[in-house]
Amino acid sequence: PNDITDANVFAAALNQQVTALNASASGGVLVNLSDVTSIPYFTTVPAQSIPLDAATAAAVNAQFALYNTQVLPLLVQLQVITQAEAGARMVNFEEGINFPIISDDDLTDLSQILQGPPANLPPPIANLLGQLRQATADDLILLPASSVLGTLANPADPLSVIGVAVPLVDQLVLTTTEQGRVATASAAYNATIQGLAAANDLAYVDARSELAQLTQGGIAYDGGTLTSDYITGGSFSLDGVHPTSRGYAHVANILIRAINAKYGATVPQVNIGDYGTITVTNN
C-alpha cells in the first residue's frame, strides 16, 4: 500500500497547480477534502457481522483458549508485547452477532516469534496469529469485505471461515489508528487548500461540510432527498466511492453557487432530479 502523501509535498504540489491556474485563468475554485471515512465504502458493512449460535461460538473459543490464556500472557512476561496489546489481541466469540477477527499491521508481528520456543507453533498457525485481533466497534470494515466475510479461505477446508478462523486481511479494514492518520493528513491538506484559496482570491468550497449534510439527514431537492446511504441514498454509485449522475449534479450545483457568489456570475444551477441514480427493482 502507498504511504499517505506528506503534507509539505502536498502543499508544494498544490501551490504549483494554483500558480499555473492563475497564469492561465482569471479565477477558479478550490475544493477541500471531505471526510472520506463517512462515505458508503467505509460505512456500509457493520463491524459486527459474524452470526454464530452458542455451540459454534463455544467451539471457536476452544480453538483460541490456549492462545488467550497461555500464549498472550507469556508474551507479556517476555516483554514481547504490552499488557494492553495482549488485551487487544484476546479473541472471544459469543452467541449472536460478533466482531470478526482481523489482521492489524500496527500490532507487533509475532509470526516468526511464535515459531520459536517456547511456543514452537507450526508456520501456518504462527502466521495466522501474527497480527491477529478481533475488530471493535471503532474499526471500519470496507465495502469489498461484504463478499469475503464468512467465506472459506481454503475451499477444501470447511473450518477456514474468514472472520472466524482466518483473519480478514488488513487491506479490508480501516483501523482506528489508520483513521487517525487519515484525519491528521486531511486536516493538514485542508488547511493548505483553504489558505491557498484565500491567498490567491479564489472561490472556496467546503466539501467536508457538504458531505456532512448528506450523512446527517440528507439534502433536499425537488423530488426527493440525497443522503450518503448505500444504494438508496441516491448520491453514491455501487462502488461506494464515486457519485452517481445525481450526485455529480449536486456537486455541480455546489461549485456553481461558489462561482456565482465569488465572481458575481449568473450560471444557472442544474435540476438534480433530471439526473439518474441507482434504481432498486425486484425484476
Can you name each region flagged by the protein language model?
Residues 4-12, 180-187, 242-249:
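Soluble non-cytosolic domains of exported or imported proteins
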Residues 13, 17-20, 24, 192-203, ...:
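Structured segments of extracytoplasmic/periplasmic soluble domains
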Residues 42-199, 207-231, 246:
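Acidic, Ser/Thr/Gly/Pro-rich low-complexity segments that form flexible
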Residues 1, 31-35, 207-210, 241, ...:
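Active-site-proximal beta-strand/loop segments in catalytic clefts of secreted hydrolases
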Residues 1-63, 250-251:
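Conserved, well-structured beta-alpha core segment at the onset of a catalytic domain
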Residues 30-32, 197, 201-209, 263-272:
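Surface-exposed patches in mature extracellular/periplasmic domains of secreted proteins
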Residues 228-280:
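Histidine-centered active-site loop/cap adjacent to the catalytic His
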